[in-house]
Amino acid sequence: MANRYPDIVFSVAVGNEATVDWTDHFVPVPHMIEYVRRVKQAVVQPVTFCENYVPWQDKLVDLVPELDFISLHTYPVWEYKHIHEAIDYTCENYDSVARRHPGKPVVITEAGWATSSNGRGMRAEHASQELQDLYYRDLLEWSRRAGVLTFVFEAFDEPWKGSPDPLEPEKHWGLFTVDRRPKLAMQTLYPELMSDAASSQIG
């Protein structure tokens, strides 16, 4: 697929969050190195691996030389950070990995903020559209100023994820609801979305 659409696929990630202790699809680092080498022989795009910031400090040091760039995940709200601490914590996560591996490009491939929570894994009061809006404003300002390529997580809510509880935080990371309604962060960035939504309801 990557070779068929080289103008669309700009890089290939060999796995996602597969070396952290809490994953249900754990892959040992030597196996990951083997997979990366095999993929690099098969595609022309840069090859990476996506992981939480912590394993890049030590566990993945043997993997780093095999990659074209490091893909980093950072979620302050999962680590019980208040909104006023959030962007500084994201910057610290990025800087710690960049300093650990000088000369290797680092891309943030997941950063986000939940909009609802039942208290599992984060304080319920820390998850809201208002706080997501504030975090994304800070994140976009910092990433532009610092020149750090950043991908946000995620476009749409995923109500099938996590537990059956409707307030399960895994379900509520989207910039849009599952039925494509823009949340506050998108309304702030693109006010025209609201007028477009109103027009579509009238029409």
Residue ranges and their predicted role:
Residues 1-8, 61-66, 99-101, 144:
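Acidic (Asp/Glu)-rich catalytic clusters
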Residues 1-27, 57-58, 108:
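Active-site groove signature of glycoside hydrolases
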Residues 9-16, 51-90, 113-114:
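Aromatic- and acid-rich polysaccharide-binding/catalytic face
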Residues 26-34, 84-92, 123-134:
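Alpha-helix N-cap and loop-to-helix initiation/capping positions
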Residues 75-120, 148:
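Glycoside hydrolase catalytic-domain groove-lining segments
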